[in-house]
């Protein structure tokens, strides 16, 4: 029997507010345990929650970015369960009337070497507070509780079960990760837990429209773990069904060392949490004016820019996807193209190639690229006008990078930089290509005279001989001859 995988994701994005969702305590990462837990976070008697306006605004921003409905009123509810790192005995979340309802994510999936577009529908995105953290490693026979994270604002983004493979799930998660950083609502730091995924996975006979029993894999904090966990879980469920067994609805954890999921507990349903409206929080009213105000502050979104890059610049879907994976990359690329609009593909190749490689090697982001877009564009112009070859350009780029300095200053503040840096390096080292036809003809004549055997081999039909002669001409010119011109002159001389 052939099986179809069905996947839905629940993503917890930590919102980039400086204070918590219902208290004034700091959300900064890395403080000593319990140093950033106030009376509200500790659930001391008599304290009351006060809603953080910034968290609501970020939720609205997300809803507008995905074409969702913004609910007004929106209701906060108590989600009741017991766990040591949940001091109140309940979590303030949303059940009925979340802030964001519906919407969709458009993504590009590269699978089996093919590029395809897919739309994943969203069920909702609701606000909630994070729980604390249980610490087991540093204690013998007991656990420690760190409540710094308790009360941190989260936006839980719930998708419909529209994904059919781990590749689609990873593409969705990456697209969502890009979006929340792009619109400035989450820093997306997966190592610090700012962006975590829960995957709901089931399988069913191919062609069936009935959903199978799902298992939820919790707290996947890397795209690689997300892919591996889904692939393992699909294999596990298929093996059970093909052996005549049945799938138990469970919450499972992924063990990255063993590359497998293991049961954590039986999976709860909504009624197990006994949701009811929180009596300490009034229904949230979101005015049309507030929504319009947030809408005006939205930047151009990644999907819109991808479409424009493909249409206006003639880039492939793959290139457009890479260039919109981060807002800083996209803005840097557009600034380079603004200086060299005649060749957006050449600009894309260098931004994704040399510039990305050097930044990655130094652990820097595009925001602090030491070369300004104008400096890079001038170098690319020298390739385009034949002043230097692509090979020499890479050496010039290396020297430009070294001379541009090591300070982490944004290229957006690069007024007064030496825009003639590429030309100075080229001229000071005599790197300009020989493009004079008569000079190149003399070089070709000398090489042909010195290599009669290769000439005879070419005339006998051996194309490798031409490459050898080409190499000899470039060697004689110390790499400074224009390769395209040399190729043309050499072929002409050999066929005379």
Swiss-Prot record:
It comes from Nitrosospira multiformis (strain ATCC 25196 / NCIMB 11849 / C 71). This is Aspartyl/glutamyl-tRNA(Asn/Gln) amidotransferase subunit B. SUPFAM superfamilies: GatB/YqeY motif, Glutamine synthetase/guanido kinase. Its EC number is 6.3.5.-. One of its GO terms (molecular function) is ATP binding. Belongs to the GatB/GatE family. GatB subfamily. Heterotrimer of A, B and C subunits. GO terms for biological process: glutaminyl-tRNAGln biosynthesis via transamidation; translation. The keyword Ligase applies. It comes from the Bacteria. The keyword Aminoacyl-tRNA synthetase does not apply. Pfam families: GatB_N (PF02934), GatB_Yqey (PF02637). It catalyses: L-glutamyl-tRNA(Gln) + L-glutamine + ATP + H2O = L-glutaminyl-tRNA(Gln) + L-glutamate + ADP + phosphate + H(+); L-aspartyl-tRNA(Asn) + L-glutamine + ATP + H2O = L-asparaginyl-tRNA(Asn) + L-glutamate + ADP + phosphate + 2 H(+). Allows the formation of correctly charged Asn-tRNA(Asn) or Gln-tRNA(Gln) through the transamidation of misacylated Asp-tRNA(Asn) or Glu-tRNA(Gln) in organisms which lack either or both of asparaginyl-tRNA or glutaminyl-tRNA synthetases. The reaction takes place in the presence of glutamine and ATP through an activated phospho-Asp-tRNA(Asn) or phospho-Glu-tRNA(Gln). Gene3D superfamilies: 1.10.10.410, GatB domain, N-terminal subdomain (1.10.150.380). It is an enzyme of class 6 (ligase). InterPro entries: Asn/Gln-tRNA_amidoTrfase_suB/E (IPR017959), Asn/Gln-tRNA_Trfase_suB/E_cat (IPR006075), Asn/Gln_amidotransferase (IPR018027), Asn/Gln_tRNA_amidoTrase-B-like (IPR003789), GatB (IPR004413), GatB_C_1 (IPR042114), GatB_Yqey_C_2 (IPR023168), Gln-tRNA_amidoTrfase_suB_CS (IPR017958). Keywords: ATP-binding, Ligase, Nucleotide-binding, Protein biosynthesis.
């Amino acid at each position: 029997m052939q099986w179809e995988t069905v996947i839905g994701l629940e993503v917890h994005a930590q919102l980039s507010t400086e204070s918590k969702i219902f208290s004034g305590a700091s959300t900064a990462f890395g403080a000593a345990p319990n140093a950033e837990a106030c009376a509200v976070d500790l659930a001391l008697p008599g304290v009351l929650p006060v809603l953080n306006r910034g968290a609501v605004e970020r939720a609205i921003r997300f809803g507008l970015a995905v074409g969702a409905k913004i609910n007004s009123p929106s209701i906060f509810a108590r989600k009741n369960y017991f766990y040591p790192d949940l001091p109140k005995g309940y979590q303030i979340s949303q059940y009925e009337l979340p802030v964001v309802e519906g919407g969709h994510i458009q993504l590009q999936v590269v699978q089996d070497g093919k590029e395809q577009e897919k739309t994943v529908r969203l069920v909702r995105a609701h606000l909630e507070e994070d729980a604390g953290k249980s610490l087991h490693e540093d204690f013998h026979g007991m656990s420690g509780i760190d409540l710094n994270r308790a009360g941190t604002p989260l936006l839980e983004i719930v998708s419909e079960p529209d994904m059919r493979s781990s590749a689609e799930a990873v593409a969705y998660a990456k697209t969502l990760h890009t979006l929340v950083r792009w619109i400035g609502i989450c820093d997306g730091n997966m190592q610090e837990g700012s962006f975590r995924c829960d995957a709901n996975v089931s399988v069913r006979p191919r062609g069936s429209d009935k959903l199978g029993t799902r298992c939820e894999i919790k707290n996947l904090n890397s795209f690689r773990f997300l892919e591996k966990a889904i692939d393992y879980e699909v294999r596990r469920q298929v093996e059970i069904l093909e052996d005549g067994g049945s799938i138990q609805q469970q919450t499972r954890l992924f063990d990255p060392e063993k590359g497998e999921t293991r049961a954590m507990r039986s999976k709860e349903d909504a009624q197990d949490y006994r949701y009811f409206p929180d009596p300490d929080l009034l229904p949230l009213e979101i005015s049309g004016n507030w929504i319009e105000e947030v809408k005006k502050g939205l930047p151009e979104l990644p999907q819109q820019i991808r479409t424009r890059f493909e249409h206006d610049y003639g880039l492939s879907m793959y290139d457009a996807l890479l260039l919109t994976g981060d807002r800083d990359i996209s803005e840097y690329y557009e600034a380079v193209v603004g200086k060299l609009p005649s060749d957006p593909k050449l600009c894309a190749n260098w931004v994704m190639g040399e510039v990305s490689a050097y930044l990655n090697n130094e652990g820097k982001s595009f925001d602090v690229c030491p070369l300004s877009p104008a400096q890079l564009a001038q170098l690319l112009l020298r390739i385009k006008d034949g002043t230097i070859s692509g090979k020499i350009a890479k050496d010039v780029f290396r020297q430009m990078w070294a001379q541009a300095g090591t300070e982490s200053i944004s290229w957006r503040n690069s007024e007064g930089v030496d825009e003639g840096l590429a030309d100075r390096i080229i001229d000071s080292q005599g790197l300009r290509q020989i493009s004079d036809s008569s000079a190149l003809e003399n070089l070709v004549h000398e090489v042909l005279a010195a290599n009669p055997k290769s000439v005879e081999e070419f005339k006998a039909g051996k194309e490798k001989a031409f490459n050898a002669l080409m190499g000899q001409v470039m060697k004689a010119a110390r790499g400074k001859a224009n390769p395209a011109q040399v190729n043309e002159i050499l072929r002409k001389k050999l066929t005379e």
